[in-house]
Amino acid sequence: MSITKDQILEAFAAMSVMEVVELIEAMEEKFGVSAAAAVVAGGAADAGAAAEEQTEFNVILTAHGDNKVAVIKAIRGATGLGLKEAKAMSEAAPVAVKEGVSKEEAEALKKELVEAGATVEIK
């Protein structure tokens, strides 16, 4: 008996963030791929236009730094995740802490995480 796409989606929906992260890592290892998005090189004029139009930003944690506890607390405060999930997120760097947020919210979160000792990018 084969599993349908709907059954797979239901299984994903029932998983915690930590379980999804572990599943993605296992899939990357098994299939020899990376879940990182491919970067497409475009013309400089196109990049400038796209940057001007961007209204939603992603806050990416690239490293948790030396003060891991403070970074985990900052992640919990920003995302509402539990301790276990926030710890897993900090250890899975690079990882998106928040996606699709305004520039102001992204800058505020970046400042909070950097003050906690993390290395952060906004994309």
Curated annotation (Swiss-Prot):
Keywords: Ribonucleoprotein, Ribosomal protein. GO terms for biological process: translation. GO terms for molecular function: mRNA binding; structural constituent of ribosome. Pfam families: Ribosomal_L12, Ribosomal_L12_N. Forms part of the ribosomal stalk which helps the ribosome interact with GTP-bound translation factors. Is thus essential for accurate translation. Homodimer. Part of the ribosomal stalk of the 50S ribosomal subunit. Forms a multimeric L10(L12)X complex, where L10 forms an elongated spine to which 2 to 4 L12 dimers bind in a sequential fashion. Binds GTP-bound translation factors. This is Large ribosomal subunit protein bL12. It comes from Shewanella sp. (strain MR-4). The gene is rplL.
